[in-house]
């Protein structure tokens, strides 16, 4: 059996250690379904974090800007300034969209709570993600790539 070396680095978009091919991250973060790649990480075309953190810093800046916008949207939902267009009534195969104005009070209340918390949860997930990504970048940037034997 022939032993080969693989160079690995951390992806600037997801932070995970993956193979490096020709100076950029190899395709990763995907599944193959019926011969097609689905869910490929957008970091595949960037240099590893050890070499550059330009894309990582851009992601952190973009998400940081989105967080107050998401919280503001949640507040607008809470105060009634934003409402969903539709609510979903029923389950599974019997789902149907109903205009928000035609929904029952209980359905409206549930839809508003759900929408408000979807904005808040997304903001919280963004805060958590950028904290983790920044920690990985601080640890890995300007360090050596990893060589493994396969």
Q: What does each model-found stretch correspond to?
A:
Residues 56-85, 122, 126, 133:
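Non-transmembrane amphipathic alpha-helical segments
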Residues 11-14, 41:
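Short cysteine-rich clusters marking metal-coordination/redox-active sites
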Residues 4-10, 24, 34-37:
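Short metal-coordination and nucleic-acid-contact micro-motifs, chiefly zinc-binding Cys/His arrays
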Residues 103-150:
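C-terminal, charged low-complexity interaction regions
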Residues 49, 56, 63, 94, ...:
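Amphipathic alpha-helical coiled-coil segments and their boundaries
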Residues 33-55:
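Short metal-binding segments enriched for Cys and/or His
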Residues 73-108, 129-132, 140-142:
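Extended alpha-helical coiled-coil "stalk/arm" regions
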Residues 17-35:
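Short recognition patches in nucleic-acid-associated and regulatory proteins
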């Amino acid at each position: 059996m022939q032993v080969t070396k693989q160079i690995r680095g951390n992806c600037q978009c997801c932070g995970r250690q993956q193979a490096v091919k020709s100076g950029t991250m190899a395709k990763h973060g995907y599944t193959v379904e019926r011969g097609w790649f689905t869910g490929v990480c957008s970091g595949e075309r960037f240099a590893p974090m050890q070499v550059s953190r330009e894309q990582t810093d851009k992601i952190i800046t973009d998400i940081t800007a989105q967080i107050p916008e998401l919280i503001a949207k949640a507040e607008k939902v809470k105060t009634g300034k934003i409402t969903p267009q539709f609510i979903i009534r029923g389950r599974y195969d019997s789902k149907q969209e109903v205009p928000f104005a035609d929904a029952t009070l209980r359905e409206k209340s549930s839809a508003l709570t759900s929408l408000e918390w979807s904005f808040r949860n997304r903001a919280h997930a963004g805060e958590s993600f950028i904290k983790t990504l920044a920690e990985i970048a601080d640890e890995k940037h300007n360090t050596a790539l990893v060589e493994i034997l396969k």
